[in-house]
């Protein structure tokens, strides 16, 4: 074979799309599609048609550029098998490692609190509206559900992980199926409410504020940051030695782009289908009731008068069940990350990093009591879920997903080539706007 043929063959091999790339594309996509998606239509549809159209324009750039920035940070370490904690320690020392451990824990733990509130409200709504049973004590329901999940986690962790992986695709398929099945129920209410002569850009209910708050729920819903570090390590081990760091970065960006497109297509279609079936006022009611959109859809179809279609009857019961399964799936997935993070913090600060001073069983018990106890307190208090996402969950995710990579690009020599780019400004702006929601909620 000539030198030219070898070069052509090498280039063809480099440009090929492998089965592992498809697996990771679907893995990133599946990680992001969870219970958080069930609240996106409520916030997106709350302000009517124009804000959700603006969110549609922003959705892909937010998903792609923010996750690409985090992936570039993970790629910047000298060790191809090093995770994000090792990479941050390499750039910023041990203090940086402690900071990233705290960020990871506090980025995931509030999500468990959110899911604790959500699963309690969803179950109680299903119990009272679909099953027509008398109301139960909120504290008892929250405690029962959390103890049930704790039992499953304690005695069947391996089974739980396997079941979670099987639930991802049926949940995504059910979202797409529901979105398509809602089309016959679409109406023009959301379009009729558009009054171009009376549009307010500013103010509490203005378009800009609605989109600003919508950015937070997009950061929350379009989030697969927990798996980015593992994804980058896998791709570096697969590609870097043979093709180099630059090619690996392009391959990671390509996979993140395709995963983001899939994610945005499914979530935005679901959001639009819900909005055209319901109305902005219905979305406001769902927010006030503190329930996910599927539970509200179930109640909506239950209240229809006259003869119901088969779909309406199935959705009346099926929507809440799908929501419960989605929340269970998301809770289990985030619990594992929270447990790992809290174990690390307890070990580091309680036992000075000495693993011989405490058994793993005792460590897991201490962490589980704190996690489940704090989740029960929040679930019983029943704060508004969207407010909790916007004021707590999304800002912490944004600090990890957006601001940490941008700070690293400014400071780390290995990331210097990415400085001065327009997409850095965009990612920084998204991170700051999301964090500033905390200030907005206070005032």
Swiss-Prot record:
Gene Ontology terms for molecular function: L-serine transmembrane transporter activity; symporter activity; threonine efflux transmembrane transporter activity; transmembrane transporter activity
TM ranges: 22-42, 44-64, 97-117, 140-160, 163-183, 207-227, 259-279, 319-339, 366-386, 389-409, 423-443
Topology class, membrane: Multi-pass membrane protein
One GO BP annotation of this record: amino acid transport
Keyword Membrane assigned: yes
Keywords in alphabetical order: Amino-acid transport, Cell inner membrane, Cell membrane, Membrane, Symport, Transmembrane, Transmembrane helix, Transport
Compartment list: Cell inner membrane
Reactions that this protein is recorded to catalyse: L-threonine(in) + H(+)(in) = L-threonine(out) + H(+)(out); L-serine(in) + H(+)(in) = L-serine(out) + H(+)(out)
Predominant location category: membrane
InterPro entries the record matches: Amino_acid_transport_2, Hydroxy_aa_transpt, Thr/Ser_transpt_TdcC
Superkingdom, natural source: Bacteria
Cellular compartments per GO CC: plasma membrane
Pfam family, one: Trp_Tyr_perm
Keyword Glycosyltransferase: no
Stated role: Involved in the import of threonine and serine into the cell, with the concomitant import of a proton (symport system).
NCBIfam families attached to this UniProt entry: PRK13629.1 (NF010152), stp (TIGR00814)
Similarity remark: Belongs to the amino acid/polyamine transporter 2 family. SdaC/TdcC subfamily.
Protein name per the record: Threonine/serine transporter TdcC
Organism of origin: Salmonella typhimurium (strain LT2 / SGSC1412 / ATCC 700720)
């Amino acid at each position: 074979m000539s030198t030219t043929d070898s070069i052509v063959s090498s280039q063809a091999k480099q440009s090929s799309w492998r089965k592992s790339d498809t697996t990771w594309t679907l893995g990133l996509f599946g990680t992001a599609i969870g219970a958080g998606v069930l609240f996106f239509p409520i916030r997106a549809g709350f302000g009517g048609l124009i804000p959700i159209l603006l969110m549609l324009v922003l959705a892909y750039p937010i998903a792609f550029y923010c996750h690409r920035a985090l992936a570039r940070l993970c790629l910047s370490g000298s060790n191809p098998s090093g995770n994000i904690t090792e990479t941050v320690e390499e750039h910023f020392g041990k203090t940086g490692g402690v900071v990233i451990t705290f960020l990871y824990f506090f980025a995931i733990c509030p999500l468990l609190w959110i899911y604790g509130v959500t699963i309690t409200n969803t179950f109680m709504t299903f119990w009272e509206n679909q099953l027509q049973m008398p109301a139960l004590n909120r504290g008892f329901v929250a405690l029962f559900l959390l103890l049930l999940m704790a039992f499953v986690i304690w005695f069947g962790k391996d089974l739980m992980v396997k079941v979670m992986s099987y639930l991802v695709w049926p949940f995504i398929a059910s979202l797409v199926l529901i979105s398509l099945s809602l089309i016959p129920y679409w109406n023009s209410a959301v379009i009729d409410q558009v009054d171009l002569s009376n549009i307010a850009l500013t103010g509490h209910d203005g378009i800009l504020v609605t989109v600003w708050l919508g950015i937070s729920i997009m950061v929350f819903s379009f989030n697969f940051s927990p798996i980015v570090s593992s994804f980058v390590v896998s791709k570096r081990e697969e590609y870097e030695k043979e093709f180099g760091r630059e090619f690996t970065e392009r391959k990671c960006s390509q996979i993140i782009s395709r995963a983001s497109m899939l994610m945005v297509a499914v979530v935005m279609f679901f959001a639009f289908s819900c909005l055209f079936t319901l109305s902005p006022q219905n979305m406001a009611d769902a927010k006030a009731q503190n329930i996910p959109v599927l539970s509200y859809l179930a109640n909506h179809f239950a209240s229809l008068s006259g003869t119901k279609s088969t779909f309406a009857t199935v959705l009346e019961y099926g929507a809440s069940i799908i929501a419960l399964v989605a929340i269970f799936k998301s809770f289990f997935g985030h619990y594992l990350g929270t447990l790992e993070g809290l174990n690390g913090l307890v070990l580091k600060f309680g036992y000075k990093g000495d693993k011989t001073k405490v058994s793993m069983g005792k460590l897991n018990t201490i962490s589980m009591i704190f996690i489940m106890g704090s989740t029960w307190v929040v679930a019983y208090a029943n704060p508004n879920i969207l407010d909790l996402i916007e004021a707590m969950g999304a800002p912490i995710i944004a600090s990890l997903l957006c601001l940490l990579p941008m700070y690293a690009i400014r400071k780390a020599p290995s990331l210097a080539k990415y400085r001065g780019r327009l997409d850095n400004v965009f990612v920084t702006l998204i991170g700051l706007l999301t964090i500033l929601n905390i200030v907005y909620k206070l005032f």
